[in-house]
Amino acid sequence: MSEQEPYEWAKHLLDTKYIEKYNIQNSNTLPSPPGFEGNSSKGNVTRKQQDATSQTTSLAQKNQITVLQVQKAWQIALQPAKSIPMNIFMSYMSGTSLQIIPIMTALMLLSGPIKAIFSTRSAFKPVLGNKATQSQVQTAMFMYIVFQGVLMYIGYRKLNSMGLIPNAKGDWLPWERIAHYNNGLQWFSD
């Protein structure tokens, strides 16, 4: 095994004369990239022009913030809608047999959306408070509640298909009054 010689940079790592012989270009002398407008390209700008530019920029930023808030509100509103196909598929694949996993899944499909509906304001808290976007955020909140309702409906249908929802007359027999059709007459005696 032969010993390798160290790299060139390793030999001259601490040699200051070696570093000085390389011409290092200052980044201030490099040209700006295309489309970049720095302070040097503006030249002589009056105070009024700077104020007008800053007002235009602040108005554009406010408009951009408004647009971003509406987009964020719709992202929040569409989160439950994205889980609807998966929940339908899981509900279908788990079958209608009475087992703990499908029952818990169906109950979670009922309880999760109820909790989410009651915490709608906290879910939309980052985008609330701007009067310019209030109507659009309220529309997104309404759709959020609708999508949560769809998830609850999937859970209800799952529980109904398992027979856990009492919806037939036979499910309520213990609370029915007993009807006597013979008016106290006994037909058979011992």
Curated annotation (Swiss-Prot):
Annotated Polar residues bias: 38-57
GO CC aspect terms: EMC complex; endoplasmic reticulum
Region span, Disordered: 25-57
Localization: Endoplasmic reticulum membrane
The keyword Chloroplast is assigned to this record: no
GO terms under biological process: phospholipid metabolic process; phospholipid transport; protein folding in endoplasmic reticulum; protein insertion into ER membrane by stop-transfer membrane-anchor sequence
Pfam families registered for this protein in UniProt: EMC4 (PF06417)
Transmembrane region(s): 98-118, 136-156
Major localization class: endoplasmic reticulum
Keywords: Endoplasmic reticulum, Membrane, Transmembrane, Transmembrane helix
Domain of life: Eukaryota
Membrane topology field: Multi-pass membrane protein
More about this protein: Present with 1320 molecules/cell in log phase SD medium.
Function: Part of the endoplasmic reticulum membrane protein complex (EMC) that enables the energy-independent insertion into endoplasmic reticulum membranes of newly synthesized membrane proteins. Preferentially accommodates proteins with transmembrane domains that are weakly hydrophobic or contain destabilizing features such as charged and aromatic residues. Involved in the cotranslational insertion of multi-pass membrane proteins in which stop-transfer membrane-anchor sequences become ER membrane spanning helices.
Subunit structure: Component of the ER membrane protein complex (EMC), which is composed of EMC1, EMC2, EMC3, EMC4, EMC5 and EMC6.
Family designation: Belongs to the EMC4 family.
Name of protein: ER membrane protein complex subunit 4
Classification of source organism: Eukaryota, Fungi, Dikarya, Ascomycota, Saccharomycotina
Gene: EMC4
